[in-house]
Design a protein with these regions (language model features):
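Cytosolic regulatory regions built on CNB/CRP/Popeye-like sensor folds
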Residues: 1-220
Length: 220
């Protein structure tokens, strides 16, 4: 085991030789994303500054290079291209983690290319109840509250920390938002174009079934 879910470590690992499995579901160790030579992992701990969101296990013999958080932040600040590489990899990883680990990377290229990273201040509204459903968001730093107008007043329904997602029902239909989402602290989100994703689902029937099953109990 390289690191375990909920650990406070925050360095980034690069795979020089071998493979690792990222266990994305704590209730099923067989639900994994496999990473090969040339890949890196641990970037979400670097970005969000929170506990590890997944367990990573070596798949046989591996040769890894560990880069401390401070060294990575220095690299990102001094080499503009480094941040772009890290951001792109993080978007791929987060979509695989939250939607389906088995999706082909090539299928996601258009989705990832159109995704953007946005910053919010505490109190900023990310989603407003009744708005058009045109994006899904992955919270990569900070936290959100979900609220709904009930009896003429806003009622908080849930709290969502970083490493989770909101607005996912936009991936399935364009119905108005059923709840509002607000940043509780300074936050950063990955904004995913729902129209492009719905077009992907229209071509990939199996993937659409997986997404529908995954989101059937969600509300936003």
């Amino acid at each position: 085991m390289i690191f375990e879910r909920n650990e406070y470590t925050n360095s980034v690992f690069s795979i020089v030789e071998g493979r690792v499995n990222v266990q994305i579901n704590p209730e099923d160790e067989n639900e994994v994303v496999e990473l090969k030579k040339g890949s890196f992992f641990g970037e979400m701990g670097l970005i969000a500054g929170r506990r590890r969101t997944a367990t990573v296990v070596a798949k046989g013999e591996c040769f890894l290079v560990e880069t401390p958080r401070r060294a990575m932040l220095k690299l990102i600040s001094s080499v503009p291209g480094a941040k772009k590489v890290l951001d792109t990899a993080a978007i791929y990883r987060q979509i695989q983690t939250h939607l389906t680990p088995n999706i082909e990377k090539d299928l996601l290229k258009e989705i990832v290319d159109s995704a953007t990273i946005e910053s919010l201040s505490a109190g900023d509204k990310l989603i407003s109840e009744g708005d058009e459903s045109d994006h899904m968001f992955i919270i990569r730093a900070g936290s959100m509250t979900v609220s709904k107008i009930i009896g003429g007043r806003s009622v908080i329904l849930s709290y969502i920390p970083s490493g989770n997602y909101v607005g996912e029902m936009a991936l399935l239909n364009s119905e108005p938002r059923s709840a509002s989402v607000t940043a509780t602290v300074a936050s950063e989100v990955i904004k995913i174009d729902a129209v492009a994703f719905r077009e992907l689902l229209s071509r990939e029937a199996v993937l659409k079934l997986v997404i529908e099953e995954k989101f059937q109990d969600r509300i936003v």
